[in-house]
Swiss-Prot record:
InterPro entries assigned: GlcNAc_MurG, Glyco_trans_28_C, GlycoTrans_28_N
GO cellular component terms, semicolon-separated: plasma membrane
Localization in the cell: Cell inner membrane
Pathway(s) annotated for this protein in UniProt: Cell wall biogenesis; peptidoglycan biosynthesis
Any single biological process term in GO: lipid glycosylation
EC top class, as a word: transferase
Catalytic activity: di-trans,octa-cis-undecaprenyl diphospho-N-acetyl-alpha-D-muramoyl-L-alanyl-D-glutamyl-meso-2,6-diaminopimeloyl-D-alanyl-D-alanine + UDP-N-acetyl-alpha-D-glucosamine = di-trans,octa-cis-undecaprenyl diphospho-[N-acetyl-alpha-D-glucosaminyl-(1->4)]-N-acetyl-alpha-D-muramoyl-L-alanyl-D-glutamyl-meso-2,6-diaminopimeloyl-D-alanyl-D-alanine + UDP + H(+)
MF terms (GO), sorted A to Z: UDP-N-acetyl-D-glucosamine:N-acetylmuramoyl-L-alanyl-D-glutamyl-meso-2,6-diaminopimelyl-D-alanyl-D-alanine-diphosphoundecaprenol 4-beta-N-acetylglucosaminlytransferase activity; undecaprenyldiphospho-muramoylpentapeptide beta-N-acetylglucosaminyltransferase activity
Protein name: UDP-N-acetylglucosamine--N-acetylmuramyl-(pentapeptide) pyrophosphoryl-undecaprenol N-acetylglucosamine transferase
Keywords, sorted A to Z: Cell cycle, Cell division, Cell inner membrane, Cell membrane, Cell shape, Cell wall biogenesis/degradation, Glycosyltransferase, Membrane, Peptidoglycan synthesis, Transferase
Record gene name: murG
EC number: 2.4.1.227
Residues noted as binding UDP-N-acetyl-alpha-D-glucosamine in the record, renumbered to the chain: 28-30, 140, 176, 204, 257, 302
Bilayer topology: Peripheral membrane protein
Organism: Xanthomonas oryzae pv. oryzae (strain MAFF 311018)
Length: 441
């Protein structure tokens, strides 16, 4: 079997003789940016960082911009792939774990931390097999599938919000230092005159529902004294501009905002989605918000995130449906004319902030880095990074047994067996250290 890992060609860092910390993160900015924030802290302390991601994913474009070497695995997500592909999941996972083990043996990380994403699962399991200290950081209140699995094996489970895992350490989600350094809400908002400044954040891809609902709601209010700055993503820019023009609402429509600290400092109120990183920034900046969770988010995790701020009276939650524009109009009618309420929400958000999250995560990583139980690989493993014939026979027998059980089963029964098979694959790996060192069989 061929190696499913691609090693970075980035030149070694001057501190390459020091064992690095390996970050597992990818797929979305919500996983990648917290990892980058922690990488920045570690690098400032003289600790080298290496990254494991997925071929062709967002991290392959973002991470090299920060001079961090990134290795990749040929892997995609397991959710929503249909029954045929689901049936082959155990074999694909086992191959990916072997490939990840190949990378880990080359990099020899002092510790490994998962922020989530496609490559994090195989990378985390390989770390567990090879004895590298494994940590998990879950950004959302509803944990992702990868971090759910890895939390069972991790030394420490860190979270952005309380209540995600039993035995968690709620350290917060990392935010940019310039956002955390903004003045307190009272220093920014008290005594302001002029239009109410509304910041609309659609995320890097934009949010069509916000492009439509915000102009419609503001137009229905009869052109209030409002100044709008709307970040909409490049693909939806023209659509957003047309929507504001048709509603006769003046707005600055921007595909991307480079200086988010300045944008938050300018804003009296924010209308946005409820991704974990965005909410961490709202709290760090200290600004009230109207949150419209992405309805199709996995496990509805954005609603769970939003409920945390709503429970502290730091935000208003509006669900995405056909009546959104009408309900947004009603909420804005109150908030735009009530500066005391906006200040109260901003102060409540600030009390939830954890501006030192990146520093705390780095501290915990380094605490665990000296407590690994790594065992040196056997001579034959060092030579070939291979898998023994006896172990290969066990895996083949297990797969053939499961395949035989699928015949004549209902869809539900097949899915049930598949989940059990996947669990057995993980258990088999954990019971046989060194099995998935990576490479060719």
């Amino acid at each position: 079997m061929s190696v499913y890992a691609h090693l970075s060609q980035t030149p070694a860092h001057p501190s390459a003789r020091i064992q690095p910390v390996m970050i597992l993160a990818g797929g979305t900015g919500g996983h990648i940016f917290p990892g980058l924030a922690v990488a920045k802290v570690l690098s400032a302390r003289g600790v080298p960082v290496t990254w494991l991601g997925a071929d062709g994913a967002m991290e392959t474009r973002l991470v090299p911009q920060h001079d961090i070497p990134i290795d990749t695995l040929a892997i995609t997500g397991l959710r929503g792939k249909g029954m045929v592909k689901l049936l082959g999941a155990p074999l694909r996972v086992m191959r990916a774990v072997r490939a990840a083990g190949f990378v880990l043996r080359k990099r020899q990380p002092r510790a490994v931390i998962s922020f989530g994403g496609f490559a994090a699962g195989p990378g985390g399991l390989a770390a567990r097999l090879l004895g590298a200290p494994l940590l998990v950081h879950e950004q959302n209140r509803a944990p992702g599938m990868t971090n759910k699995v890895l939390s069972r094996f991790a030394r420490r489970v860190l979270t952005g919000f309380p209540g995600s895992f039993a035995g968690e350490e709620a350290v917060g989600n990392p935010v940019r230092a310039e956002i955390a350094a903004l003045p307190a809400p009272a220093d920014r908002l008290v005594g302001r005159t002029g239009p109410v400044c509304v910041l609309v954040l659609g995320g890097s891809q934009g949010a069509r529902v916000l492009n439509q609902a915000v102009p419609t709601a503001l137009a229905a209010l009869g052109h209030p004294d409002v100044e709008v700055r709307h970040q909409c993503g490049e693909k939806l820019r023209a659509e957003a501009e047309v929507a504001y023009a048709q509603a006769s609402v003046n707005a600055s429509v921007e595909p991307f905002i480079a200086d988010m600290a300045a944008a938050y400092a300018w804003a009296d109120l924010v209308v946005c989605r409820a991704g974990a990183s965005t909410l961490a920034e709202l709290c760090a900046a200290g600004v009230g918000s109207v949150l419209v969770p992405f309805a199709a988010a996995v496990d509805d995790h954005q609603t769970r995130n939003a409920e945390y701020l709503v429970g502290a009276d730091a935000a208003v939650l509006l669900k995405q449906d056909d009546s959104l524009a009408v309900r947004l109009q009603q909420v804005l009618q109150t908030l735009l004319t009530d500066p005391a309420r906006r200040l109260s929400m901003a102060n409540a958000a600030r009390t939830l902030a954890k501006p030192d999250a990146a520093e705390r995560i780095a501290d915990i990583i380094l605490q665990e880095a000296g407590t690994g139980d790594r065992q040196p690989p056997a001579v034959e493993e060092r030579a070939g990074f291979g898998i023994g014939k006896e172990q290969q026979h066990k895996q083949d027998s297990m797969q053939n047994s499961v395949d035989g059980q699928f015949s004549g089963r209902s869809t539900a029964a097949v899915a049930n067996l598949q989940c059990r098979s996947l669990f057995d694959s993980h258990r088999l790996a954990i019971l046989t250290p060194g099995t998935f060192a990576g490479g060719a069989a």
